């Protein structure tokens, strides 16, 4: 009697949901995923935009996204220019949550990655935005992932992991 053909081995990928506070965070996260993801890679990533607002609104949007599909990990990138809730869920359902602080904003994180000489953790949000949009990212294209390609190549991002813990947290989940 012939035996049934064996079923092919299917490896399950780690699924990652990345949520950006607004359209600029979405574009930067989309740029990172584009650099790190391959078709046969170890993870499948989906990037969403929470459409701005307070951290509470961003977390509410994230919970709604997690109710639609199952993910292994959810990375939420938010600015610190507004106060965060005092307690953050470590898990939502079966999804592990990772909260990444862009201090004071995404543009501040970008300046940390580049190691810009005139920026520090005490630089204001407006000053960070002015520095980034004057020198690195064309302001009218800041919501497009391709706008980050020239000044934020994979080599720089990997080299910046040690001095930029927020970037390291994101990249760790994309491996």
Segments and roles (model prediction):
Residues 1-15, 26-49, 56-175:
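C-terminal accessory helical subdomains adjacent to catalytic cores in phosphodiester-
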Residues 17-21:
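Short hydrophobic beta-strand that contains or immediately precedes a catalytic carboxylate
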């Amino acid at each position: 009697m012939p035996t049934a053909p064996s079923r092919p081995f299917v490896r399950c990928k780690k699924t990652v949901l990345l949520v950006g506070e607004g359209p600029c965070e979405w574009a930067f996260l989309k740029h990172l995923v584009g650099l790190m993801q391959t078709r046969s890679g170890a993870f499948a990533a989906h990037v969403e935009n929470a459409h701005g607002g307070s951290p509470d609104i961003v977390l509410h949007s994230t919970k709604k996204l997690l109710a639609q599909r199952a993910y292994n990990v959810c990375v939420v990138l938010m600015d610190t220019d507004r106060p965060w809730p005092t307690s953050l869920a470590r898990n939502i359902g079966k999804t592990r949550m990772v909260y990444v602080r862009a201090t004071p904003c995404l543009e501040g994180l970008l300046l940390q990655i580049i190691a810009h000489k005139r920026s520090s953790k005490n630089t204001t949000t407006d000053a960070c935005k002015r520095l980034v949009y004057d020198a690195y990212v064309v302001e009218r294209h800041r919501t497009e992932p391709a706008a980050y390609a020239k000044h934020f190549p994979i080599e720089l991002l990997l080299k910046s992991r040690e001095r930029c813990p927020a970037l390291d947290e994101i990249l760790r989940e994309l491996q």
